[in-house]
Amino acid sequence: MRMEYSEEAIKELYIQYWKCMISKDEAGLRNLMSDDYYLMHMTGTRQSADEFISGLLDGTFNYYSAVHDDIQVSVNGNTATMVGKSKVLAAVYGGGKNRWRLRGDFTLKKENENWKLTSSKASTY
């Protein structure tokens, strides 16, 4: 598989990730994540996929829109890293809607010829 194809597939995965977050699509998110996926929030809290998706579904995390400024991908065989930068309209932890400049540092691995998110770390830019 050409490197460019993998990079484009991973960029599309990032876009799909945000679409699933906005629509609260549990099945879609799980399809994008490895079984051992975890998210590290800006606060330093680490959550498993189950914990994070539960918070998404119960309204702890609400995402309304995402405009992607930049997506950088580096592929190394069957693993990859990605940095996505997006302006996100969100309301989290009971707060009001705010626009955030969110940076996600992701790790990925290839499972059965499909790229899966293995971790993400949230920060701002």
What residues fall within each predicted segment?
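A beta-strand edge to alpha-helix "cap/lid" segment located at domain peripheries
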Residues: 2-23, 27-31, 36-125
